[in-house]
From Swiss-Prot:
Binding site for GTP: 20-25, 36-42, 66-67, 123-126, 153-155
Described purpose of this protein according to its UniProt entry: The S.cerevisiae Ras proteins modulate the activity of the adenylate cyclase catalytic subunit and therefore affect the biosynthesis of cyclic-AMP.
Taxonomic lineage: Eukaryota, Fungi, Dikarya, Ascomycota, Saccharomycotina
Source organism of this protein record: Saccharomyces cerevisiae (strain ATCC 204508 / S288c)
Family per similarity comment: Belongs to the small GTPase superfamily. Ras family.
Name of the protein this chain belongs to: Ras-like protein 2
One biological process term in Gene Ontology: regulation of cytoplasmic mRNA processing body assembly
Keyword Ubl conjugation tagged: yes
Sequence motif Effector region, location on chain: 39-47
Length: 322
């Protein structure tokens, strides 16, 4: 099958790093097969090279960027357009390694994603006597970025092709895998939205540590809810006890009132009974007095009665003269 532009995959690769770490030397060694010894600060250079990667003809479109801070305003534009990034530091400069994290975070922010094809490169491996950064330090930095790591020498052409080819493979392979991951995440988000609000049946979208945290948070909510419920129950019990005490006090007061009323009524009844007895005594006394008076009058009237009888006899026409 004849080659044409439509059959050739093109990779847009960007070389990023601090000033003087050998970005241009690596790019020129790859594209022109020679080493540039003198340092000429780059503003921005673009290189193209046709290569064969895994039996596939490809074109590497490489952007060599400026490492100086005064050109930092240009970074976002090439970060936005790049597909893969070669993050380069010099093994003779510890600060150049530390700078890589700043570039990495800026790339993620500009690309608005949590994955970008990246290869971390420790250049100038031929200057072993001036080494400030160990292989392990470089590897640890690459692990933080979830990226492959290589030490290279642009001067001796060590691992130069391998660094660029590895980056192209990441763009080719991880790009498709990453798109698949995005699709799966979108489906997972939709499933999460569908199950949202289903209470205990809801399952967190993420697993592992996120699930554990969700459970811990749920446990915290449960304890909090239990505390609130207990507080409410305590409040209800307190109010119920208060009402009970008030009812008891009310009943006691009512009983006392009833007792007082009963006592008063009994007193009144006793008083009335006493009055009745007194009245009866008085009546009896009066009756006795009347009876005695009548008896006395009868006794007094007895002699007078005989005289009267005699008078009645004399008045019948018979008169006795003494």
């Amino acid at each position: 099958m004849p080659l044409n532009k439509s059959n050739i995959r093109e990779y847009k690769l960007v070389v990023v790093g601090g000033g003087g770490v050998g970005k241009s030397a690596l790019t020129i060694q790859l594209t022109q097969s020679h080493f540039v010894d003198e340092y000429d600060p780059t503003i921005e250079d673009s290189y193209r090279k046709q290569v064969v990667i895994d039996d596939e003809v490809s074109i590497l479109d490489i952007l060599d960027t400026a490492g100086q801070e005064e050109y930092s305003a240009m970074r976002e534009q090439y970060m936005r357009n790049g597909e893969g990034f070669l993050l380069v530091y010099s093994i003779t400069s510890k600060s150049s390694l530390d700078e890589l994290m700043t570039y990495y975070q800026q790339i993620l922010r500009v690309k608005d994603t949590d994955y970008v094809p990246i290869v971390v490169v420790g250049n100038k491996s031929d200057l072993e006597n001036e080494k400030q950064v160990s292989y392990q330090d470089g590897l640890n930095m690459a692990k933080q970025m979830n990226a492959p790591f290589l030490e290279t020498s642009a001067k001796q052409a060590i691992n130069v092709e391998e660094a660029f080819y590895t980056l192209a493979r990441l763009v080719r392979d991880e790009g498709g895998k990453y798109n698949k991951t995005l699709t799966e995440n979108d489906n997972s988000k939709q499933t999460s939205q569908d199950t949202k609000g289903s209470g205990a049946n809801s399952v967190p979208r993420n697993s592992g540590g996120h699930r554990k945290m969700s459970n811990a948070a749920n446990g915290k909510n449960v304890n909090s809810s239990t505390t609130v419920v207990n507080a409410r129950n305590a409040s209800i019990e307190s109010k119920t006890g208060l009402a009970g005490n008030q009812a008891t006090n009310g009943k006691t007061q009512t009983d006392r009132t009833n007792i007082d009323n009963s006592t008063g009524q009994a007193g009144q009844a006793n008083a009335q009974s006493a009055n009745t007895v007194n009245n009866r005594v008085n009546n009896n006394s009066k009756a006795g007095q009347v009876s005695n008076a009548k008896q006395a009058r009868k006794q007094q009237a007895a002699p007078g009665g005989n005289t009267s009888e005699a008078s009645k006899s004399g008045s019948g026409g018979c008169c006795i003269i003494s």
